[in-house]
């Protein structure tokens, strides 16, 4: 029987957000996310708690996604899910649920690479947002990843630069923890940075060859900076918080932009798309807009709802793979370390 419309259910469970979305022929009908606030008390994601919460959330989240979309499970053409990379326990919940649902409905199962989904989120149809033409450079920046990817086609991607230690999102969160900010600290640093002087304090940028990144040295430098200044003035952080946040953000954005400029120079590709949780940062968005005007780049910034982990990005990859008849078997397994 021919389907008039192609409905894809996307499931995302790579870290601490349980998400489900329904897409129809490239257009998102629903995008539901259940956040796990319990991790705030620990200053970071606790893997065991995350997987337990996914088990509690996944059925109601999928139910809500179908309900909001006005679609019954029998109308689904396929189930797409995040196979990796991510936290193994979290991935297992989403993978097991997706496999069971696809088997029960006797419909195709589609595995999705989480990092690929952050890039292809730009192809979700949303009013007011343009889609990049191939080839383009994608910079995926999040709490767990920092990469520059040369994208020649939907499924022809090559990582040309990545972090050799910590991810950029971790640099934001660990710096925020040193300043006494809550988790995740990135949004709070971004908010305070707008009120401070970005050149109040100087932090040395790490020197890394090629297009690779490093943030562990910067985190250590910030730690020593805080220790040194609070030793002489216990109120140093309180008195200078906005300036410290602005200076940290200015340094991190400088590192990202320096590598992007180098990537554009080497590849001769000046179409730039960003993705991942840190792409919500107002500073990096502003820096890209400046580069667009000053350097002639064409930049693509995702809608805020598609920056953090979400199932809409999984669904769009599922749809593109469905069109290619690119399905996976019930024998597939979750993989914590999955290469792009």
Briefly describe each language-model feature range.
Residues 1-4, 112-136, 317:
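Conserved phosphate-binding catalytic cores of ATP/NTP-utilizing and phosphoryl-transfer enzymes
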Residues 5-85, 114:
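N-terminal beta-alpha supersecondary unit
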Residues 18-23, 138-140, 146-150:
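Short beta-strand scaffold segments in enzyme catalytic cores
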Residues 81-106, 124-125, 282-290:
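Short Gly/Thr/Asp-enriched flexible loops that form oxyanion-binding sites at enzyme active sites
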Residues 111-112, 272, 289-314:
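Conserved phosphate-binding/catalytic loops in two-lobed NTP-binding clefts
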Residues 118-119, 302-340:
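Glycine-rich phosphate-binding/hydrolytic loop that grips phosphoryl groups
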Residues 152-195, 219-220, 224-230:
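Glycine-rich phosphate-binding loop plus the immediately following alpha-helix
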Residues 191-272, 281-295, 322-325:
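A contiguous, well-structured pocket-lining segment that forms one wall/lid of small-molecule binding clefts
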């Amino acid at each position: 029987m021919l389907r008039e419309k192609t409905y894809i259910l996307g499931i995302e469970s790579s870290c601490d957000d349980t998400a489900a979305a329904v897409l129809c022929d490239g257009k998102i009908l629903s995008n539901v996310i259940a956040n796990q606030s319990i991790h705030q008390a620990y200053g970071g994601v606790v893997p065991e708690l995350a997987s337990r919460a996914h088990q509690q959330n996944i059925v109601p989240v999928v139910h809500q996604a179908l309900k909001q979309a006005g679609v019954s499970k029998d109308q689904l053409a396929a189930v797409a899910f995040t196979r990796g990379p991510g936290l193994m326990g979290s991935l297992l919940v989403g993978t097991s649920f997706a496999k069971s649902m696809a088997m029960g409905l006797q419909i195709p199962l589609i595995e999705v690479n989480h990092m690929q989904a952050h890039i292809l989120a730009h192809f979700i149809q949303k009013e007011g947002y343009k889609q990049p033409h191939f080839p383009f450079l994608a910079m995926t920046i999040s709490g767990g990843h920092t990469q520059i990817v040369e994208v020649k086609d939907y499924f022809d991607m090559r990582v040309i630069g990545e972090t050799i230690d910590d991810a950029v999102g971790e640099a934001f969160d660990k710096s925020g923890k040193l300043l006494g900010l809550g988790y995740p600290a990135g949004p709070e640093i971004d908010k305070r940075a707008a009120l401070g002087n970005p050149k109040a304090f100087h932090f040395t940028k790490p020197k890394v060859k090629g297009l690779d990144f490093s943030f562990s040295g910067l985190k250590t430098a910030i730690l020593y900076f805080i220790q040194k200044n609070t030793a002489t003035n216990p109120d140093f952080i309180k008195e200078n918080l906005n300036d410290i946040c602005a200076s940290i953000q200015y340094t991190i954005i400088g590192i990202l932009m320096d590598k992007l400029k180098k990537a554009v120079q080497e590849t001769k590709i000046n179409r730039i798309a960003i993705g991942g949780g840190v792409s919500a940062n107002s500073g990096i968005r502003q820096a890209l807009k400046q580069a667009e005007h000053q350097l002639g780049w064409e930049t693509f910034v995702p809608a805020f709802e598609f920056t953090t982990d979400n199932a809409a990005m999984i669904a769009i990859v599922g749809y593109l793979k469905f069109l290619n008849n690119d399905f996976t078997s019930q024998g597939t397994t979750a993989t914590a370390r999955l290469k792009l």
